[in-house]
Amino acid sequence: MDPIGINKVLDHLAPSELIKPVKSCHNKPSVLVLDDRIVDAATKDLYVNGFQEEIQYQNPTPENLQHMFHQGIEILDSARMINVTHLALWKPSSFKLGNPVDFALDDNYDTFWQSDGGQPHQLDIMFSKRMDICVMAIFFSMIADESYAPSLVKVYAGHSPSDARFYKMLEVRNVNGWVALRFLDNREDDQLLKCQFIRLLFPVNHENGKDTHLRGIRLYVPSNEPHQDTHEWAQTLPETNNVFQDAILR
């Protein structure tokens, strides 16, 4: 059959006027650069604690960082989302004795998961059913964790380890606070990460460190209430939301 005849048959089976164009998701950025020193309107929704001016990193204290940790949790929990972190099974590739993965989930700034082995380190997150994840929040601190702080984080998602696909790589250049990763480029209709399994891979640390620290991570699904965009989070912060400022003034 000639090409014209083939096209007629195909048009009869699926009329071209009924076929809607589909936007490809392959053009979505595969790397997300994180640096809360750089004030950028395009990334403001990422930083739950807000942007930090570079001068405010000179004299931070553990109390300042601890305040940011708990402040971020309060802001996240007020954002009309449901925290499903503890509905998952969390399985690390390794952990140092005394620093289990539970310490990344206990809402305590002073405790953390620490890997114990060769890179890349890995953290698998498994739910009993498919979840509609709208936000993955991770606490990073270059100051507190130094060479234990990850500089790259690869995110994979799927229904199981066997079909998990790469979603995005986070390049953590300089962050001290909570980062809220939303999935705006994943599904055009609902902007959710629909999955039962998530894998986080930590291939590289800052300062060529070997083991990784993770002080806090949370997963959220939408609630039945109207969704609150993350740009509203900044409105819940105190007028001087840069908590390092107090340390400098002292």
Curated annotation (Swiss-Prot):
GO molecular function (one): enzyme regulator activity
Pfam families: ANAPC10
Record annotation: effect of changing S94F: In DOC1-1; G2/M cell cycle arrest at 37 degrees Celsius
Residues in DOC domain copies: 60-246
Pathway info: Protein modification; protein ubiquitination
CDD domains: APC10 (cd08366)
GO-annotated biological processes: anaphase-promoting complex-dependent catabolic process; cell division; chromatin organization; protein K11-linked ubiquitination; protein ubiquitination; regulation of meiotic cell cycle; regulation of mitotic cell cycle
Keywords (A to Z) from UniProt: Cell cycle, Cell division, Cytoplasm, Mitosis, Nucleus, Ubl conjugation pathway
Cell division in keyword set: yes
Entry annotated with the keyword Coiled coil: no
Remaining remarks: Present with 1364 molecules/cell in log phase SD medium.
Protein purpose: Component of the anaphase promoting complex/cyclosome (APC/C), a cell cycle-regulated E3 ubiquitin-protein ligase complex that controls progression through mitosis and the G1 phase of the cell cycle. The APC/C is thought to confer substrate specificity and, in the presence of ubiquitin-conjugating E2 enzymes, it catalyzes the formation of protein-ubiquitin conjugates that are subsequently degraded by the 26S proteasome.
Subunit structure: The APC/C is composed of at least 13 subunits that stay tightly associated throughout the cell cycle: APC1, APC2, APC4, APC5, APC9, APC11, CDC16, CDC23, CDC26, CDC27, DOC1, MND2 and SWM1.
Stated name of the protein: Anaphase-promoting complex subunit DOC1
Source organism (scientific name): Saccharomyces cerevisiae (strain ATCC 204508 / S288c)
Gene: DOC1
